[in-house]
Amino acid sequence: MQTNPNMFLNRELSWLRFNSRVLDQCSRPLPLLERLKFVAIYCTNLDEFYMIRVAGLKQLFSAGVNISSSDEMSPLQQLKAIRKYLHKEKDLLEHYFNEIISDLEKENLFIKNYENLDNNLKQKVYEYFFSTIFPVIVPIAVDATHPFPHLNNLSFSLAVNICDNTHPELIKFGMIRIPRVLPRFYEVSANVYVPIESIVEKHTEEIFPGYKLLTSAAFRVTRNADMVIEEEEADDFMMILEQGLKLRRKGAFVRLQIQKGADEQIVEFLNTHMKIFHKDVYEYSILLNLPSLWQIAGNKTFTHLLSPLYTPKTLPPFDENLSIFDAIDKEDILIIQPFESFDPVYKFIKEASKDPEVISIRMTLYRVEKNSNIVQALIGAASAGIQVTVMVELKARFDEENNLHWAKALENAGAHVIYGITGFKVHAKVSQVIRKKGDKLKFYMHLSTGNYNASSAKIYTDVSYFTSKVEFARDTTSFFHILSGFSKNRRLQTLSMSPNQIKEKILEMIALEASKGSEGVIIAKMNSLVDSDIIKALYEASIKGTQIDLIVRGIFCLKPNEEFSKNILVRSIIGKYLEHARVFYFKHSEPNYFISSADWMPRNLERRLELMTPIYDERSKAKLAQFLRLQLSDNLLAYELQNDGEYAKVASNEKVIDSQQILEEYVSKIYKTLKKDTDQSRATHLASKLFKEN
């Protein structure tokens, strides 16, 4: 099939549509603080989009690049389309925010500016200002002797026009930087939050004594946060990375967010110094710095405004009284998080770190939390003399500093730490434990679609797979050898690895289903689909009658076309859990189920080390089948791609199906049923049976 730009949706505009679906959650009949969370998530997503994607397009435009995407939109065309889209959507964001705040007030939860407080609360704010804010804020004069200051990425400040009390004709421009150590809101009482800029503005004349405040405007800046590291020229990669992180703080300004109605002189002054294109200036009639709304959304006093808290469950064959290695010896085990608990993953490493029979632990780390029990267990194992090898991906965007910290801690404990492979990111999620069993060695593996991160495991849907099969032992050993040594043969036998194998394998399996015509079936769940070769292969399969169901949460570049895609159904699921699992089903392949760390994107398939894992175990395959079937039945959280490239909520007059809530209920039901069953084999069989029946 000839490549045609009309086959593809634009990557950046597709991402914007995804983020619009996130914002659309604010229109759902959710508890109010849950709706507020989606405002915060939407704005956080948009920050990163501007820092990386928009910044990248600006660089391409400056370099004179005319074509940069499969749909052949130039960088300038994309920038214009992005700005038009976001300026229009800003009105919708303001509408939802005002609606939610108004509804919160009916529930007696308020965000109030200083002037709207009663005298008692004003006195508390006054005391808070002088005890907590005044000592750490940074007042800045800007004039001939005071240059324009450095503003950190996503920094939040107050710009002021002030005049000399004795010479009012002398007008000065100043800024007050608000440090991130200060909370975005001051919780002046159990139900009242005061925006910090409102407090600072009220006390401007104490901050600039002898001057009178004329006008003020809160503003927030976004910088280019992409980081290019010349790995080939680096003798000390860790040092080069640390230097890169310092340079990132000085990235070019790419966006200015400012209060609507700000004095024209203030806006002009900021623009003059930051040189931001006027279409990248966004004026808001609502509060700025909305990612910080998590502070209010986490209010424990108003639990009735939150969704009921779900506690992930550990199901058989895992048992707190049974060694995790004994459980894996009996059978392969697949768990679906966060409905099932992440605890077995932690226990896998924790138990290995204390087991005298364990001689080696190998693991990849991409994103870990700041206080990681898993990394602490690895440190303990290394300190105890176990051979610990850890691949810490120092290039994991926005986690570089945290990963640097853990890499140093692991090295200090005696672990062998690998920083990555030149020119690639290591995105695979895999760990391997080697134990002595008599005079032989036994290998245990964990392969996953998600990170070794207990925090994200509570809010991301992912699939984990535990096995002790010999073929997985061989391939994971080879994979870690590739990471730690030199290897030109980057191919595995049972697992598939990128950059050499995964795309090749996927194209082979698509071609096989296409050869079966209307008997062919493909179901693929992932975060994003961008790769043009795979898109063309899916078109060809659809033309031949293959039924293709794609569950893609985020970016989706296959353009609907009656001629090419009539047998392709595309849906995106947005709910309280972020859909992060990659699960693939190809009816006529053997095996026919796979999980993977890789999305179908060029970066994953060509510029990262990823793994795709075949699932042979019948119970695990049945579990994945039910998982995919449930997602395809969802008519509450699901959106379907329309012929015009837009998404619409799934229309249905049938019983409401919320795939995430149903999984919570099913797992809870199984857990409750099995809680008192002490017969491990019966409990395991019943768990599998209940899951399949439900």
UniProtKB/Swiss-Prot annotation:
| PTM (free text) | An intermediate of this reaction is the autophosphorylated ppk in which a phosphate is covalently linked to a histidine residue through a N-P bond.
Q: Which keywords does the record carry?
A: ATP-binding, Kinase, Magnesium, Metal-binding, Nucleotide-binding, Phosphoprotein, Transferase
Q: Does the keyword Calcium apply?
A: no
Query: E.C. number, please?
Result: 2.7.4.1
**Where, by residue number, is the active site?**
H427 (phosphohistidine intermediate)
- Specify which residues bind ATP according to the UniProt entry for this protein: N45, Y460, R553, H580
Q: Does the keyword Glycosyltransferase belong to this entry?
A: no
- Cellular component GO terms held in the UniProt record: polyphosphate kinase complex
GO BP annotations listed: polyphosphate biosynthetic process
Q: Which family does it belong to?
A: Belongs to the polyphosphate kinase 1 (PPK1) family.
PANTHER family attached to this UniProt entry: POLYPHOSPHATE KINASE
**HAMAP family assigned to the protein according to its UniProt record, in alphabetical order:** Polyphosphate_kinase
Q: What is this protein called in UniProt?
A: Polyphosphate kinase
Tell me which species this is from.
Answer: Campylobacter coli
Gene name tied to this protein: ppk
